[in-house]
Amino acid sequence: MPKFFNEVWLRDMSPKTMQGVVDFLGNLRNGVRPHNLPGDLKLLAGPWLSNEEAKVYFVFEIDDPTETFEAFAERVADGLFLKRRLTLIQDWDGARSFSKYLSGRQLKAA
């Protein structure tokens, strides 16, 4: 299943925002998800809070990340999140496989 590194910018680090974020991500960490997150979403690592800015990070796997839109947009509407960046990531076996592929291919003339 595809894995994603998720960076989420928080509205701020006020007590109300932080409590909402801690509750939401704490529940997700314990396997409790809101009704509008798909059942195949699995938190793999994190969450972590940035020391430099109002941001949290976590890694999850999901078959179709577009299915997280409603749950994320709801947190934006509730004033917890500002924006996010989802980065599709590859495990190290995948990186080795890609390196082997690059090393073995023939350069074609343009």
Question: Would you name each region that the model predicts?
Answer:
Residues M1-K55, D63-E70, Q90-A110:
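Short S/T/G/P-rich N-terminal loop/turn motif that feeds into the first structured element of a domain
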Residues P38, A77-D78:
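Generic structural signal for alpha-helix starts
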Residues A71-R75:
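Short, aromatic/basic amphipathic alpha-helical patches
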Residues D78-D93:
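Conserved short beta-strand edge segments in small beta-sheet-based binding/regulatory domains
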